[in-house]
Amino acid sequence: MDIRISVQIFRSGETTSLWGRSNELGEDGVGGTLTGELEVGEVVSMELSLPLAAYPLKLRALVRYRIGLRHGFEFLAINEQQRDVLQRVCEMLATGTK
């Protein structure tokens, strides 16, 4: 699966927007390649365009790792509706159904 990611980070009084793609998704986080670099430990706002979701999923996430432009994120404070969408998408990926 190819997921579009949009990330916003607030630094030095300015909001910076990055975008990218991912093919790694779990119930607790996502990995992807972005158009710029983030630092490990930064908290970002992100939007994920997922199948089974009528609108992009808006989440807060913590940067857990970075290798070049490749980043790993851990989702923070997920509500029940967001958790349900993530679970359904992950189940769909595990079974190979659409």
Model-derived regions: residue spans:
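Structured alpha-helical
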Residues: 1-98
